[in-house]
């Protein structure tokens, strides 16, 4: 990584302590410049209200704003892009709706997933989980460092060049060894929000 700076994606999470908006604001204050709004099992009108607020906040910080799952909402409010989970709309279908101007990320757990998203026109891959995480239901098999090394190696052999972002149960201490596998960046949520000072924790991560 240039300047040894971690490319950090922050995924919003509603907790007893922080709202979606507060969680994003703290990550932005700490230097993160990529926010994904993730509101599973929430009516789309509520997601839209939160998305519009967060979109304005991200613009203030010059940050990329991506919404999980809601392709039509991304197009409606002109967010920067969408992240699609394994049970969400296929990447190719989303690309057909959004065209080339929007960012589309796909979720992968295997090299075959990566290859499928690459052929479908994904801009980046969220790859995981690194380990068990309590912030997500229906986890795919845990990858660990060896899983990432294997996927990165197979990508090189197949001449597939696509940013790969590690996700799932990652702690600050894990990040250096994960980055050494050839991973492009890290996606975090609970690790930051469980810290005593989420802003300071984000700064520490950004400066690893």
UniProtKB/Swiss-Prot annotation:
The keyword Magnesium applies. 2-[(2R,5Z)-2-carboxy-4-methylthiazol-5(2H)-ylidene]ethyl phosphate binds at residues 133-135, 169. Pathway: Cofactor biosynthesis; thiamine diphosphate biosynthesis; thiamine phosphate from 4-amino-2-methyl-5-diphosphomethylpyrimidine and 4-methyl-5-(2-phosphoethyl)-thiazole: step 1/1. GO terms for cellular component: cytoplasm. Its EC number is 2.5.1.3. SUPFAM superfamilies: Thiamin phosphate synthase. One of its GO terms (molecular function) is thiamine-phosphate diphosphorylase activity. Keywords: Magnesium, Metal-binding, Thiamine biosynthesis, Transferase. Binds 1 Mg(2+) ion per subunit. Its cofactor is Mg(2+). Belongs to the thiamine-phosphate synthase family. Condenses 4-methyl-5-(beta-hydroxyethyl)thiazole monophosphate (THZ-P) and 2-methyl-4-amino-5-hydroxymethyl pyrimidine pyrophosphate (HMP-PP) to form thiamine monophosphate (TMP). This is Thiamine-phosphate synthase. It comes from Phocaeicola vulgatus (strain ATCC 8482 / DSM 1447 / JCM 5826 / CCUG 4940 / NBRC 14291 / NCTC 11154).
